[in-house]
Amino acid sequence: MLTSGIVILSGGLLDPNPGLIFWTAVTFVIVLLILKKFAWGPILGALEEREKAIQSSIDRAHTAKDEAEAALRKNKELLTKADAEAEKILREGKEYGEKLRADIVEKAHSEATKMISSAKEEIEQEKRRALDELRNEVADLAVQGAEKILMANLDADKQKAIVSSMIQDLSKHRN
């Protein structure tokens, strides 16, 4: 029957078709077997490789943190030595005569100030560099951790979509 240019047929999209169900199931099983044979290994390999990369990043972050702490300790020692040296210069300046006292004290103060400011600048630079490296590593780890958490919280449909996407990416990279 034809009504306003639209053909109305008996039955509809929601009527079950046993032949279609059978062939859909057969096709699904075949695709599943093909994926298991050819894609499962690369997917697991990629996941293991990612796990190793994450562990390596964590180890590098710990190493960077340890190096930063060592650099901070070293810089504190340098600052302490610079302060001690400045005090020594001041004491030696006081031992000289009244005539030379003003010149020596002035030199000692300027040298001490230069050394302290230089040491402080060096400490600040090292501290900023170490903190930047640590922030970058922590940010990378946080992103990777968030990715893992998100991957763990996906439902079955989203996981299938991600697996399909990964398979397509793998096939693109192979070709």
Curated annotation (Swiss-Prot):
The keyword Lipid metabolism does not apply. Pfam families: ATP-synt_B (PF00430). GO terms for cellular component: plasma membrane; proton-transporting ATP synthase complex. Keywords: ATP synthesis, Cell inner membrane, Cell membrane, CF(0), Hydrogen ion transport, Ion transport, Membrane, Transmembrane, Transmembrane helix, Transport. The chain crosses the membrane at residues 20-40. CDD domains: ATP-synt_Fo_b. It is a single-pass membrane protein. InterPro entries: ATP_synth_B-like_membr_sf (IPR028987), ATP_synth_b/b'su_bac/chlpt (IPR002146), ATP_synth_F0_bsu_bac (IPR005864), ATP_synthase_B_chain (IPR050059). GO terms for molecular function: proton-transporting ATP synthase activity, rotational mechanism; proton-transporting ATPase activity, rotational mechanism. It is found in: Cell inner membrane. NCBIfam families: ATP_synt_b, PRK14472.1. F-type ATPases have 2 components, F(1) - the catalytic core - and F(0) - the membrane proton channel. F(1) has five subunits: alpha(3), beta(3), gamma(1), delta(1), epsilon(1). F(0) has four main subunits: a(1), b(2) and c(10-14). The alpha and beta chains form an alternating ring which encloses part of the gamma chain. F(1) is attached to F(0) by a central stalk formed by the gamma and epsilon chains, while a peripheral stalk is formed by the delta and b chains. PANTHER family: ATP SYNTHASE SUBUNIT B (PTHR33445:SF1), ATP SYNTHASE SUBUNIT B', CHLOROPLASTIC (PTHR33445). HAMAP family: ATP_synth_b_bprime. Belongs to the ATPase B chain family. F(1)F(0) ATP synthase produces ATP from ADP in the presence of a proton or sodium gradient. F-type ATPases consist of two structural domains, F(1) containing the extramembraneous catalytic core and F(0) containing the membrane proton channel, linked together by a central stalk and a peripheral stalk. During catalysis, ATP synthesis in the catalytic domain of F(1) is coupled via a rotary mechanism of the central stalk subunits to proton translocation. This is ATP synthase subunit b 2. It comes from Prosthecochloris aestuarii (strain DSM 271 / SK 413). The gene is atpF2.
